[in-house]
Regions:
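Structured, acidic catalytic/metal-binding patches in enzyme active sites
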Residues: 36, 40-47, 52-244
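Bacterial N-terminal signal peptides that target proteins for export
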Residues: 2-15
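Alpha-helical scaffolding within the catalytic cores
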Residues: 32-34, 256
């Protein structure tokens, strides 16, 4: 999603923001721990890195422990490879994010939500009429993207993208998810949940800015407890969000864990990069692997 919201750039920003988990970092410290875990099986080793999908150029190179783990790996696994999305798939994005015919967002959200949305886009310098054809979930993602771009974050410097560029032509690349599965997250979202997602996004912008420094420090210090608290405390305050958390986090965590376990059954060294929010908490990938009997050690 750029300020012009053309098809291709909109999709790219959409994908990075969906799975960014709203984390950012300005620098990587050489502290006691990094946001990476090592998992061993009789046949394989996997390094699992919590990533940030929008970053700043100056944070590279990353901590040497992360860089060395990537270099010694045989394969690179990420959520999904945006570079492999076909033109046909790109072309379908417009029908997924917008209403057809004379339909507009006013028919699908409350007047209160619409008025708040209108004020926000006036602030961005966009005429609201330009945005009325888009679905609530897409506008929520757009707003998140614009807010983080204002803070200097850029999807071109996302950590998963950084390693993908190094892996291409040199390592096997494994997708833990797919373009269609990620789009299905929103295709199957009810109108009620879409509006809830949009309202939460609009109401959380100020707290999101305040939490950015906390998340930045948690990521660079490898502090999974603080990361979990900031990312998942909103669920304690509003149980209506449980359906959205289940769809965007927990269900995906279970599926990606199954894929990682399959990798661990095959000989090799794997470098796995997923959004940092997928690793933390009782339903995060690290805990799920531990419950399956794997020894997981933070690096």
């Amino acid at each position: 999603m750029t300020k012009r919201l053309n098809n291709v750039s909109a999709l790219r920003c959409l994908i990075v923001v969906l799975f960014i988990n709203l984390i950012a970092s300005q620098a990587v410290s050489a502290g006691e721990r990094v946001f990476m875990w090592k998992v061993d099986s009789p046949k394989a080793t996997a390094y699992i890195l919590g990533t940030v999908h929008m970053m700043r150029k100056e944070i590279y190179p990353l901590d040497s422990r992360i860089e060395k783990a990537f270099k010694r790996s045989d394969a690179y696994a990420l959520e999904f490879n945006i570079d492999d999305v076909t033109n046909i798939q790109m072309g379908t994005i417009l029908s997924d994010v917008s209403y057809g015919g004379d339909d507009t967002i006013q028919k699908h959200i409350s007047k209160e939500t619409y008025d708040t949305l209108q004020k926000k886009f006036v602030e961005y310098g966009f005429p609201i009429e330009y945005m009325t054809k888009f679905r609530p979930w897409f506008l929520a993602v757009t707003i998140e993207t614009l807010e983080y771009q204002k803070l200097g974050l850029d999807p071109r410097y996302g950590i998963d993208k950084y390693f993908l560029q190094q892996a291409e032509g040199k390592k096997s690349i494994i997708e833990l998810e797919s373009f269609d599965s990620q789009m299905d997250l929103f295709r199957t979202m009810t109108e009620k949940d879409q509006e809830l997602f949009l309202v939460y996004t609009l109401n959380d912008l100020e707290d999101g800015r305040k939490n950015l420094d906390i998340l930045m420090t948690a990521w660079s210090d490898g502090d999974s407890k603080i990361m979990e608290k900031v990312m998942f405390d909103p669920l304690k305050e509003d149980r209506q969000l449980s359906r959205i958390y289940e769809k965007l986090f927990y269900e995906r965590n279970r599926n990606m864990t199954d894929k990682i376990i399959k990798m661990l059954a095959q000989k090799g060294t794997y470098f796995v990069a997923v959004g940092a929010g997928h690793l933390v908490g009782k339903q995060g990938i690290i805990e799920l692997l531990s419950h399956k009997g794997y020894a997981v050690r933070q690096q």
